[in-house]
């Protein structure tokens, strides 16, 4: 009897899911747009993105449609990351997660209570497809850390790009455990693929992103956390009734930093941060570059390091700047003149005023003490030559 009830409940859940999917596809979803346009009209969802070209930030923004990004983990950080990339018009998104949406996830962003019970990748795909039907969404509902699934994950990221058989352009790690991070790290080291690692602390007041270029910067195994270094099973550290804290603000900021740097990398503008942290308590953003560990436990990392050192280093081109003799501003109402650096200055300083700044001179310079004393002595000598009676006679005659 109980088995029949369970079967009926499963059928009901499936029908509800199909009904919700039908509602999603029929609620005024816009038509697909073949080409991005910079036309400023209310019906153009790309006008403000294409404005980056007009402002000389991005050379060709529409290239984003030729990019494929894999997001591993569609939780608090990953779902917001997928949302932002979808709104930016990314060409293809590949989502990996094996968890389901729960009401406990509602303190974070993106998911809604009516999606509880759905797999995270399915719920995300429905919402993202409605937000921007131009984006190709591919979902994989499995755990990448198992042996069989890892091989499938490896095959997917290396052959599911925009072009058939080509790798994705970037892998974004948005997982919340070290085992999955190590799996992503191993896969990207093996396939020599660039990827971003991200995370939020258990107390929810700090986060970070790290850009990993195999061989050039440190991989996740080069400087592993203590849990990984000691081969501790994370599941043994969890206690019943105890969970990590979670703030949508910290996760939103971390996701924003992740997507911002992903866009800079994909569209080749600005400076991509190798490591960027965030401390909410002091609003501190540490930034640094982590170099590879020559004794890394990942053998593929060591191979990539050797390849990187053998790779020819790019030579920086010196750009000659033409200097014009013409004045920058033709008008000079105040009569300001520039003095060449090689013209000797005539500014002098008296010994009494050694603290006068360079380039300034005193309007009046006091005489030296020696000169003043000589003048006083001379005047004193003149007075001593006349007698008192003679001085009195001079005063009466006045």
Curated annotation (Swiss-Prot):
Keywords attached to this entry: ATP-binding, Metal-binding, Nucleotide-binding, Ubl conjugation pathway, Zinc
Protein name in the entry: Ubiquitin-like modifier-activating enzyme 5
Function (record text): E1-like enzyme which activates UFM1.
Family (UniProt): Belongs to the ubiquitin-activating E1 family. UBA5 subfamily.
Catalytic residues (UniProt): 243
Any single Gene Ontology cellular-component annotation: cytosol
GO molecular function: ATP binding; metal ion binding; UFM1 activating enzyme activity
Organism in which the protein naturally occurs: Drosophila grimshawi
Matching PANTHER family: UBIQUITIN-ACTIVATING ENZYME E1, UBIQUITIN-LIKE MODIFIER-ACTIVATING ENZYME 5
Residues the entry annotates as binding ATP: 76, 97, 120, 143, 177
Gene3D superfamilies (alphabetical): NAD(P)-binding Rossmann-like Domain
Short name of any one Pfam family annotated for the protein: ThiF
Binding site for Zn(2+): 219, 222, 296, 301
UniProt keyword annotation of Transmembrane present: no
GO biological process: neuromuscular process; protein ufmylation
Annotated InterPro entries: D-isomer_DH_CS1, ThiF/MoeB/HesA, ThiF_NAD_FAD-bd, Ubiquitin-activating_enz
KW Ubl conjugation (keyword) present: no
